């Protein structure tokens, strides 16, 4: 844990990474370790011996972090890490914006030889300038200037004592608010009044919404109970049917249409049939008329309509006995069965010849 913090601090401060050296003492079955760390040219040793090498390195890193934190303006370890990572630049900018002032302006000056430059930075805020410690990089010089400005503003006379980091930011914002222009000071009470009015309105709306919500829930519950009781006791709703006068008028129209359709179907059937005497008359209505009737009534009554593919009645079929030409005529029956079975054939001379038929 301490090794990671020390390494992160070195990376963000643009320093070389810390290097560890360890010494071992004691027998092989019970060794003891003591470590030292080199951080930016300074060496820090662990105060006591440890049973493992890792513990010795962590103790050396802890000593280094505590020593570095005591050198800075803040005394805690976490505050020192924040100082080196540039958090105070963000805090200074945020508090200046909150106080209604212009953002801080940093001016850095480079000095020293080209291969080993040094930078010194000054920050201007609310008509005041603050100088920071010189550093090897421009970024670090700006961080140092922000730290110097922050702690100098915090040391200005105040009414209440310091109570943690959150209270510290409020104190700096209050100090900076003294240097605001008069126009911004006049706008502040109006804004505070608007904020208080908005808060009261929101509170009232929340209370009214809660009360109205409770009333609505109670009403909905009562309505649900009433509807359940009514649905269990009341009969089912009646369907809407058209009046009788409309039904009679529509029925008369449908009948006239059916008669016309039937006449048209009879005329068409008479034209299609080859022989009118073979027409088959039935008392049942034609399929066309039935389909028309159903389609007409379907507009009035709520029953589904069915469409069927009806076909016409086939004409009557006459069966005739056909005799082929090539076949011999049928034998005629003999009127005299007692006569002799002879066949007479006339010859060309006028004489007749008789032949007996075979039995």
UniProtKB/Swiss-Prot annotation:
Note the superkingdom of the native organism.
Eukaryota
- Give the knockout phenotype: No visible phenotype.
Q: Which organism is it from?
A: Arabidopsis thaliana
Molecular function (GO) terms for this protein are: double-stranded RNA binding
SUPFAM superfamilies for this protein: dsRNA-binding domain-like
**Keywords recorded for this protein, A-Z:** Repeat, RNA-binding
Which SMART domains does its entry note? DSRM
The residue ranges of the DRBM domain are 1-70, 87-155
> What is the protein named?
Double-stranded RNA-binding protein 3
Q: Where is this region: Disordered?
A: 266-292, 328-359
Coding gene?
Answer: DRB3
Q: PROSITE patterns per the record?
A: DS_RBD
The record's section on InterPro entries has: AtDRB-like_DSRM_1, AtDRB-like_DSRM_2, dsRBD_dom
Q: Which PANTHER family match?
A: DOUBLE-STRANDED RNA-BINDING PROTEIN 3, PTHR46031
Biased amino acid composition, Pro residues:
328-338
What does this protein do, in the record's words? Binds double-stranded RNA.
> Which Gene3D superfamilies would you find in this protein's record?
3.30.160.20
Q: Known Pfam families for this protein?
A: dsrm
Q: Which intervals carry biased composition (Basic and acidic residues)? A: 266-280
């Amino acid at each position: 844990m301490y090794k990671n913090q020390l390494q992160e601090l070195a990376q963000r401060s643009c320093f070389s990474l810390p290097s560890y050296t360890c010494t071992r003492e004691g027998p092989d079955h019970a060794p003891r370790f003591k470590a030292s760390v080199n951080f930016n040219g300074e060496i820090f040793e662990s105060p006591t011996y440890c049973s493992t090498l890792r513990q010795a390195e962590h103790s050396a890193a802890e000593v280094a972090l505590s020593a570095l934190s005591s050198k800075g303006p803040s005394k805690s370890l976490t505050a020192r890490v924040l100082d080196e990572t540039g958090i105070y630049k963000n805090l200074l900018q945020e508090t200046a914006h909150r106080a209604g002032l212009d953002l801080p302006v940093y001016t850095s000056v480079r000095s020293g030889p080209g291969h080993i430059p040094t930078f010194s930075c000054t920050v201007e805020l609310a008509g005041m300038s603050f100088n920071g410690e010189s550093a090897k990089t421009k970024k670090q010089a700006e961080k140092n200037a922000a730290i110097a400005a922050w702690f100098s503003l915090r040391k200005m006379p105040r009414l209440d004592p310091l109570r943690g980091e959150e209270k510290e930011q409020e104190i700096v914002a209050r100090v900076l608010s003294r240097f605001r222009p008069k126009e911004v000071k006049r706008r502040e009470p109006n804004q505070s009044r608007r904020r208080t009015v908005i808060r009261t309105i929101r509170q009232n709306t929340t209370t009214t919404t809660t009360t109205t919500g409770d009333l609505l829930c109670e009403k909905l519950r009562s309505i649900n109970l009433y509807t359940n009781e009514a649905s269990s006791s009341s009969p089912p709703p009646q369907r809407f049917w058209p009046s009788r006068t409309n039904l009679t008028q529509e029925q008369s129209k449908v009948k006239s249409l059916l008669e016309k359709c039937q006449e048209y179907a009879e005329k068409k059937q008479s034209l299609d049939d080859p022989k009118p005497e073979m027409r088959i008359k039935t008392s049942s209505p034609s399929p066309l008329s039935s389909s028309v009737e159903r389609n007409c009534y379907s507009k009035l009554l709520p029953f589904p309509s069915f469409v069927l593919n009806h076909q016409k009645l086939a004409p009557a079929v006459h069966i005739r006995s056909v005799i082929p030409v090539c076949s011999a005529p049928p034998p005629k029956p003999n009127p005299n069965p007692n006569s002799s079975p002879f066949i007479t054939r006339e010859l060309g001379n006028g004489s007749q010849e008789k032949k007996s038929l075979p039995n």
